[in-house]
Design a protein with these regions (language model features):
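Glycine-rich phosphate-binding P-loop
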Residues: 8-24
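Short beta-strand-centered segment that lines the nucleotide-binding/catalytic pocket of NTP-utilizing
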Residues: 30-41
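Small-molecule kinase domains that catalyze NTP-dependent phosphoryl transfer to phosphate-bearing small molecules
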Residues: 59-66, 78, 137-182
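Conserved phosphate-donor/acceptor-positioning beta-strand/loop module used by diverse small-molecule
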Residues: 110-132, 138-148
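ATP-dependent small-molecule kinase phosphotransfer cores
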Residues: 41-96
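RNA pseudouridine synthases
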Residues: 91, 104-111
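Pre-Walker A (Motif I) flank of P-loop NTPase domains
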Residues: 2-11, 95
Length: 192
């Protein structure tokens, strides 16, 4: 099966973004990550930082869900989700590419030529990596990982009604802590 689009979902600190970029480089195709946030910001008029932050939080609370669309129209989060959906589908339609995050696995689930990948690793590997790569020092790395993963899972569940990281929702799951970041990119590129 030829895959025109590869989606990379990932646990925070697992190297998924790096794996996506390396895979795209090996295949000579574009990798979209921060570009999605920039496009959404341009289209909506929201600041890129706001778009990034909102993409990590599921709209919450009883009042938010009970009143958002019925009484007051769509929330900012709903507007961003609609734009995210559009940007991801437009990028996939342009041609072969790698898309990192942004619920692309769900958005493109009915696309026959899409390879859906989930990257994970154990807590020790990820904690060490976020300190080395991002200089995380504000709170314990483990706390930061749990918080970020919890937010990603909640956001994914809210908009997709699917369990984030659940193996059956992906074609391939890879443990970057065991396999290595470079080798993960090699494996994905070989499956393309």
């Amino acid at each position: 099966m030829k895959n025109r689009v590869i989606t990379i979902s990932r646990e925070f600190g697992s190297g998924g973004r790096t794996i996506g970029k390396q895979t795209a480089e090996k295949l000579g195709i574009p990798c979209y990550d921060a570009e999605i946030i920039q496009t959404m910001a341009q289209e909506t008029g929201f600041a890129p930082d706001y778009v990034q932050e909102a993409g990590e939080y599921a709209p919450g609370g009883f009042l938010s869900s009970a009143f958002s669309n019925r009484m007051f129209g769509p929330t900012n989060e709903d507007i961003l989700w609609e734009h995210q959906y559009k940007v991801v589908t437009d990028l996939a339609a342009k041609g072969p590419c790698v898309i990192v995050g942004r619920c692309a696995d769900y958005i493109l689930q009915d696309t026959a030529d899409c390879l859906k990948v989930f990257i994970h690793a154990d807590m020790t590997f990820r904690a060490k990596r976020i300190v080395e790569v991002y200089g995380e020092r504000e709170q314990s790395p483990e706390e930061r990982l749990r918080d970020k993963d919890k937010r990603r899972a909640a956001y994914h569940r809210f908009y997709t009604n699917m369990k984030w990281g659940y193996a059956q929702n992906y074609h391939l799951t890879l443990d970057s802590g065991v396999i290595g970041i470079d080798r993960c990119a090699d494996i994905i590129a070989q499956l393309y």
